[in-house]
Amino acid sequence: MFNRICMYSASLLLLALSATAHSDDLAVNTMNPYDMVEAVAKNTFTRFHQDIDIINTDPDHLKLIVSDELMPYIDYKYASYKVMGIHLKSTTKDQRERFVKAFQGYLVSTYAQAFTEYTDQQVRFPPGKDFSGEKMVDVNVDLIEPGRPAIKLMFKVRRLKDGSWKAFDLVAEGVSLLASKSSEISNLIRQKGIDSVILELEQRNKGNISNKTNGAKL
């Protein structure tokens, strides 16, 4: 059940980002959370279209695109710690570092696979709000497909100590990707221990990206 939610949310993320893509790279203003989301969107999908011939031959190239264009703006360390939840305090420094790396790889694989679900969509970004003094901001997005109700997305971003912003969660139709994963991971750590969970994530990350016949034309 969770994997379906996760892939659905990741697919919606990339579909929403795709609708803002244009032809030229845009400088990413990490000091403005609203500008950041749109700029990262544009650059990620510009790279996607530029590398489509490579992707057709090697779908795993999508992992490189996600790593280069998307992940620098994802606070995967913060997300990893949130996912570990109450188990964080009982882990060693080495375990935390290994888990963060494994969870980062999991996100890369998840978003790379979501690219294969890409179809042309329309997206609406409501005007940004005043974020001065805020530590966390919700960037709302409406994903629009003809003949269907708009899908409500929310990118949750947080301000870092240097004043820049990074995203750490996606909420799709009220379902938090981070909260869903936290529930699953917490249960697995309790049952198997953190080391086993790390190994399981690492093993998942070794899987290849598979093309989808009903999504992107790769």
Question: Where do the model's predicted regions map?
Answer:
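Bacterial N-terminal signal peptides that target proteins for export
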Residues: M1-S9
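Boundary of Sec targeting at the N-terminus
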Residues: H22-D24
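N-terminal signal peptide c-region/cleavage motif recognized by signal peptidases
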Residues: A16-S18
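Early exported N-terminus immediately downstream of N-terminal targeting peptides
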Residues: L26-Y111
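Short beta-strand edge/turn micro-motifs at domain boundaries
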Residues: K152-A179
